[in-house]
């Protein structure tokens, strides 16, 4: 039994040494006389997948964003919960069309805001009547809602009171109100307050 084990270990060590020798020594192929070296990979290749998020995920991205994630994260978390889709050429085409549509809508909204701002600036001043007190004081104050009501009455335009920024008006006189119609478009209107 001992002789069988020793011959097995000898044959195994011989085959290992011959394999190790083949790796360390370059081999020449007879037809081209080129040196051939075997390539041995050190690490596994990371498997990364391209995805599009279906909803906002904290610390990862926003809805509609194109991301690279590891295959395991996609397979074990994102796909079972329905939070992402694997990118396909058709999906990329649809995403591009959706982006173009959104950009066109943003451009249209901005143009409408610019047109509305020009209209406000050509109007001149909006007049507000209040019951007068001593000197220049008025009873109460002029609020953003008052200005919104006046704009609706005079121009037949609905404006949200959240976009109207007025100084604190408690006296008669002329004031400048700012209307933030769009992140890039701001209109300034004059508000004249007088007592009856």
From Swiss-Prot:
Highest taxon, organism lineage = Eukaryota
Matching entries from Gene3D superfamilies are given as: Ribosomal protein L9, C-terminal domain, Ribosomal protein L9, N-terminal domain
Q: Which HAMAP family match?
A: Ribosomal_bL9 (MF_00503)
Disulphide bonds in the chain = none
What gene name does this entry carry?
Answer: RPL9
Q: What is this protein called?
A: Large ribosomal subunit protein bL9c
Cited InterPro entries: Ribosomal_bL9, Ribosomal_bL9/RNase_H1_N, Ribosomal_bL9_bac/chp, Ribosomal_bL9_C, Ribosomal_bL9_C_sf, Ribosomal_bL9_N, Ribosomal_bL9_N_sf
Recite the UniProt keywords alphabetically: Chloroplast, Plastid, Ribonucleoprotein, Ribosomal protein, RNA-binding, rRNA-binding, Transit peptide
**Originating species:** Spinacia oleracea
Localization per Swiss-Prot or TrEMBL: Plastid, Chloroplast
One BP term from GO: translation
Q: What does this protein do?
A: Component of the chloroplast ribosome (chloro-ribosome), a dedicated translation machinery responsible for the synthesis of chloroplast genome-encoded proteins, including proteins of the transcription and translation machinery and components of the photosynthetic apparatus.
- Subunit composition? Component of the chloroplast large ribosomal subunit (LSU). Mature 70S chloroplast ribosomes of higher plants consist of a small (30S) and a large (50S) subunit. The 30S small subunit contains 1 molecule of ribosomal RNA (16S rRNA) and 24 different proteins. The 50S large subunit contains 3 rRNA molecules (23S, 5S and 4.5S rRNA) and 33 different proteins.
Q: Name one GO cellular component term.
A: ribosome
One annotated GO molecular function is: rRNA binding
Return the similarity comment.
Belongs to the bacterial ribosomal protein bL9 family.
């Amino acid at each position: 039994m001992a002789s069988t084990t020793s011959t097995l270990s000898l044959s195994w060590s011989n085959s290992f040494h011959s394999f190790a020798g083949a790796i360390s020594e370059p081999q020449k192929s007879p037809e081209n006389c080129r040196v051939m070296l075997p390539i041995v990979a050190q690490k596994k290749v990371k498997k990364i997948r391209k995805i599009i998020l279906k909803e906002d995920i904290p610390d990862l991205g926003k809805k509609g964003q194109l991301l690279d994630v590891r295959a395991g994260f996609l397979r074990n978390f994102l796909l079972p919960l329905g939070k992402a889709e694997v990118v396909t050429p058709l999906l990329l085409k649809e995403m591009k069309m959706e982006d173009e549509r959104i950009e066109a809508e943003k451009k249209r909204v901005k143009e409408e805001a610019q047109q509305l701002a020009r209209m406000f600036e050509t109007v001149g001043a909006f007049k507000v009547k209040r019951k007068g007190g001593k000197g220049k004081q008025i009873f109460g104050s002029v609020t953003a809602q008052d200005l919104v009501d006046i704009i609706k009455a005079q121009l037949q335009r609905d404006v949200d009171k959240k976009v109207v920024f007025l100084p604190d008006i408690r006296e008669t006189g002329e004031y400048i109100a700012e209307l933030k119609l769009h992140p890039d478009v701001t209109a300034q209107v004059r508000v004249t307050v007088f007592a009856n």
